[in-house]
């Protein structure tokens, strides 16, 4: 318990009291809007020099404090004298300023943690989407059970504001944040319904992403704290990214609560071989032990979300399955563990007997049906996977049309190059190649056969060969066995920070 109290005091000492004054700094809004909005919105003519005016921000904040919230309803939002006709623009001004300011202490904390761990150089690689798959290849083949969990949302933003107060001691800033959220829309409606929170996320993407990521980081910090305290093996590799917040500080008599109410519960969670992976709005929990322990963790997550974050989590969104008999989706891939059985004949003296050997291998398969559905939605093919032309691109030059198709094909090839079976990937590339040819033929008002005969089918679109083969052919001879082996094996790219729009994980 001494260690618990020391860490709590150390976490509180890191809190800063400087956020509210930063809202009135001009460079904050210049940083937020230099690339996204027209600067004329914020410029005022002051002599010969033009600078970002903070009069708009100060006037908005003053009116927010003078507003009578009991008179205005959600239906009168369009007639709100505070927002007027510039409601959307000025609400984005404040929200972007909030997002920039509130990210500063967390970014400084992350930078100091990375410097202490001396992993600054590898931090960019750790951000890659593909960095998760080598980890799964090494770990998941040893596990027996997996739980695919959907992170519940939306969460009431007042809960997030209260949690933020444990990180940063700045009462005026949080009062202003509450006022802004109230003026933006009806507080209860856009927080408790998916349609309203979707509207909020589109109009205020930076602030919404920060609040959502903070919510995820908060529950993960609690999860990792319990896991580290209850396990024989510590998760040293993850300590640098998730600060453990001691959430029982909200209760009185901290020592008594931890000693009495929680010491017995921790005995259910002792498992040195349990792994947690989060991606987008889902997470995966894998374990080698019996499903009894997985059920314990399932109930733990449900009570954590309901008791601490006051968000409802339905039990059916957390499924526990045997890994060898179940496949699940992860970042656009289908994952399952294939068991290979082999028989070895052994002989000892004059006795001969057979030995069965079972070898597990992680399979990552390209989901061909969701990809074809995404291609059909983007008008590259029909629902059956037959390529069609893209008439909306016919006004572009031939070079631009080919370049667009090549970029899509190259991005998909890079993203799915870690697949165990490349046949589905080749089909996707065939659809894009033929769709490109049909688009060019449509532009030149010709048939596909006549267009290929006139332009030459061998020279046209030769860049549709994978970029990996061209690069590897420069390193190894074309008849090299190493090149053949690399083409069959998986290649992960540690520079992929975003998934392609065609990658559908639903």
UniProtKB/Swiss-Prot annotation:
This is Maturase K. It holds the Pfam family MatK_N. Keywords: Chloroplast, mRNA processing, Plastid, RNA-binding, tRNA processing. Belongs to the intron maturase 2 family. MatK subfamily. The lineage of its organism: Eukaryota, Viridiplantae, Streptophyta, Embryophyta, Tracheophyta. Usually encoded in the trnK tRNA gene intron. Probably assists in splicing its own and other chloroplast group II introns. GO terms for cellular component: chloroplast. It is found in: Plastid, Chloroplast. GO terms for biological process: mRNA processing; RNA splicing; tRNA processing. The gene is matK.
